[in-house]
C-alpha cells in the first residue's frame, strides 16, 4: 500500500466508490489482485481513450485531405477544424495547422491565416511544417521565430572532417550530409539495421558496391566512417541529379529507392502535396525529418553569415538542393 503514490490511491478510491460494492471498499483495495485489476483498468481505459482521439484526428485529416486534393478548400477547412479539439492528442497537429493556413489563404481569410500562423510559430517553431511555411515568406514573424529556434537548437555535429572530405568530393553540402547521417544512424558508425543497412549513412551492401565502382574506392569496411560517408554522399548526389535537384524526391529515393520514387508521379500540386502523398509512412517521416535537420544545421553553420540567418528558405527555391549537375571529381 505504501508503494502506491497518494494521488494514485485517491484516484483508485474514487473509481472504487463507483465500481466496488460498499462492503468491499476500504484499504483492502490496495492489497492483492483488486489493486492490480484497478490499475490495469485505468491503463486500458486511458489507452483506449487516447487511441480513440487519435483515430478521430486521422479520420478528420483524411477527409480534409481528399477535399483539398479535389480543390474544395472550404470543405477541407471544415474537416480539419472539426478535429481541433483533439489537437493535444494528435502528434500531427503542426501538419493540421499548416494545411488549415493554406486553406484559409485560398479562401481569402488572411487575418485568420495570420492568427493560425502566429499560434504555429509559438507552439511548433522547430517543426518541419513551420519551417516549410516560413520558407514561403508570407509571414515574417513566423520566419523569424523558426530561424531563431533553428539557431538555438543544440544539434550536435560529429564526423565533421569526414563529412567535409565527402562534400568536397561529391558536391553535396556538408549540412545535408550531416542531416542525413543524424537521421540514418544518429552518428553511430557501427549501426546495422534489420534490413542489413550498414554504417553512418546506412548503406545496403549492393548500393555501396555501386558507389564504390563509381568513385573507384573499395577494400574498406562499410563501418569505416570516411568510406561510408563518401559512398553515401556519392549515392545521394546521383539520386539528386536523377530527380533534377528536387530535394524531397532525392531524400525519398535515398530512403525508399529510386525505382519507387519514379513511380510516385507528381500531380498538379506542389512539393508539399507530393510529400503528403508518399505511400510509405516511414519515407514521409524521413523526408520531413531530414529537411528539418538540414534547416537547423544550415542555420547554425559557423560559416554562414550572421545577417543571412533570418532569411528563409534556408535552401534555395524551396525544396531544391544545389549539387553540381556534372559528375563529381570522385566519379570521373
Predicted feature locations:
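N-terminal Lys/Arg-rich, disordered targeting/topogenic segments
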Residues: 1-30
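Catalytic-site microenvironment of enzymes
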Residues: 27-29, 41-43, 332
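Hydrophobic membrane-insertion alpha-helices, especially the h-region
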Residues: 35-48
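Catalytic glycan-binding domains that act on GlcNAc-containing polysaccharides
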Residues: 49-63, 67-70, 86-95, 107-332
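Helix-turn-helix repeat elements of alpha-solenoid scaffolds
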Residues: 68-81
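Soluble catalytic regions of membrane-associated enzymes that act on cell-envelope
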Residues: 104
Amino acid at each position: 500500500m505504501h508503494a502506491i503514490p497518494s494521488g494514485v490511491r485517491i484516484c483508485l478510491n474514487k473509481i472504487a466508490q463507483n465500481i466496488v460494492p460498499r462492503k468491499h471498499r476500504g484499504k483492502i483495495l490496495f492489497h492483492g489482485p483488486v489493486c492490480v485489476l484497478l490499475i490495469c483498468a485505468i491503463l486500458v481505459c486511458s489507452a483506449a481513450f487516447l487511441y480513440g482521439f487519435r483515430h478521430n484526428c486521422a479520420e478528420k485529416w483524411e477527409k480534409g485531405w481528399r477535399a483539398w486534393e479535389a480543390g474544395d478548400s472550404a470543405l477541407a477547412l471544415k474537416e480539419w477544424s472539426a478535429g481541433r479539439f483533439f489537437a493535444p492528442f494528435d502528434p500531427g497537429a503542426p501538419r493540421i495547422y499548416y494545411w488549415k493556413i493554406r486553406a484559409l489563404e485560398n479562401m481569402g481569410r488572411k487575418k485568420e491565416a495570420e492568427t493560425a500562423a502566429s499560434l504555429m510559430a509559438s507552439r511548433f517553431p522547430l517543426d518541419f511544417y513551420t519551417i516549410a511555411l516560413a520558407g514561403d515568406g508570407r509571414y515574417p514573424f513566423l520566419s523569424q521565430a523558426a530561424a531563431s529556434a533553428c539557431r538555438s537548437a543544440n544539434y550536435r555535429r560529429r564526423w565533421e572532417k569526414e563529412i567535409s572530405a565527402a562534400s568536397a568530393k561529391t558536391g553535396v553540402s556538408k549540412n545535408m550530409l550531416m542531416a542525413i547521417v543524424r537521421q540514418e544512424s544518429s552518428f553511430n558508425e557501427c549501426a546495422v539495421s534489420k534490413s542489413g543497412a550498414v554504417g553512418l549513412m546506412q548503406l545496403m551492401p549492393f548500393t555501396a558496391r555501386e558507389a564504390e565502382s563509381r568513385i573507384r574506392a573499395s577494400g574498406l569496411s562499410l563501418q569505416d566512417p570516411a568510406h561510408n560517408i563518401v559512398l553515401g554522399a556519392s549515392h545521394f548526389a546521383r539520386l539528386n541529379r536523377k530527380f533534377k535537384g528536387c530535394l524531397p524526391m532525392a531524400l525519398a529515393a535515398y530512403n525508399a529507392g529510386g525505382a519507387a520514387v519514379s513511380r510516385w508521379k507528381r500531380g498538379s500540386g506542389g512539393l508539399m502535396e507530393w510529400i503528403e502523398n508518399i505511400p510509405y509512412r516511414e519515407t514521409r517521416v524521413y523526408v520531413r525529418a531530414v529537411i528539418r535537420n538540414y534547416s537547423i544545421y544550415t542555420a547554425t553553420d559557423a560559416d554562414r553569415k550572421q545577417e543571412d540567418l533570418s532569411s528563409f528558405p534556408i535552401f534555395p527555391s524551396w525544396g531544391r538542393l544545389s549539387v553540381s549537375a556534372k559528375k563529381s571529381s570522385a566519379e570521373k
